[in-house]
């Protein structure tokens, strides 16, 4: 996965979701990332079509992997765990 492809997918209606806690999110997050904590992923209103590209990240990767599996169970077909903050930085994402 590369940043250009991810940005292309996001521009076409995809989502970038930070699944960390609100406290972690407020300390810094990827620009334009939507906060949906992994504990709320079961019932959260996901503002994307079932076939839209959805990218997830957390601090280290496991919470994003958990959230990805839940979203797949909910019928979302293009869900990708991008890993943790270090992975996001390595991909070239801007943090705010």
Task: Describe each region flagged by the PLM.
Residues 57-58:
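Short, surface-exposed ligand- or partner-binding patches at beta-edge/loop junctions that are enriched
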């Amino acid at each position: 996965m590369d940043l250009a492809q991810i940005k292309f997918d996001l521009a076409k209606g995809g989502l970038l979701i930070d699944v960390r806690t609100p406290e972690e999110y407020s300390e810094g997050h990827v620009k334009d990332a939507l906060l949906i904590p992994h504990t709320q992923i079961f019932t959260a209103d996901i503002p994307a079509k079932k076939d839209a590209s959805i990218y997830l990240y957390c601090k280290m990767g496991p919470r994003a992997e958990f959230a990805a599996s839940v979203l797949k169970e909910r019928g979302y077909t293009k869900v990708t765990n991008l890993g943790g903050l270090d992975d996001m930085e390595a991909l070239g994402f801007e943090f705010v």
